[in-house]
Each structure stands twice: as C-alpha cells, then as structure tokens.
Amino acid sequence: MTILGSISSIGNVKSISKSNNLSSLSNSSSSLQSMNSIQCGGGCGNGGLLGAVGGLVGGVLTGTGVIVGSVLHGVGSILTGGPNNCGCN
C-alpha cells in the first residue's frame, strides 16, 4: 500500500515540474518582448546602463538561458546606444 502511494506521489512531482517548465517558457517569451523594448529605448535619456542591469537581473532571476543570452547579446547596443535608437517600438 505504501509503495503504491510513493509511486503515485513521484508521478505527481513529475507532472508539477512539467507544468513549471511550461510557465517558464511563457514567461521567457514575455520577457523577450520587454527586452526588445529595452534595447530600442537605449540612449533616449532613460539610462541605458540602468536598463541593461535591470535586464540582466531579470534574466538571471527567471533562470532561462534564452533570456540571459538575449540580454548579453544586447548589452553592447544598450550601453552605447545613440539618440537614433529613440522611438523604436
């Protein structure tokens, strides 16, 4: 009786971890959209460096390599973004 209970509880843990992965994926897509707006807004007088640091912290907190890679790819343009980056949607 207890062995069957243990097996069923292990199955529940696997299903929970799968649902957490799906929610992480949906969170990463929304974070990538916000990251695009941060990259476009760099150099518009809103503190490009501050935006880069905020994006990095957000990527690390979500724990997905996709966001961290995207942030690292855009850090150079955020830090050196000129006024011609303003108004990007």
UniProtKB/Swiss-Prot annotation:
Superkingdom of the source species: Eukaryota
Protein family per UniProt: Belongs to the hssA/B family.
Q: What is this protein called?
A: HssA/B-like protein 20
Instruction: Please tell me the species this chain comes from.
Output: Dictyostelium discoideum
| This protein's encoding gene | hssl20
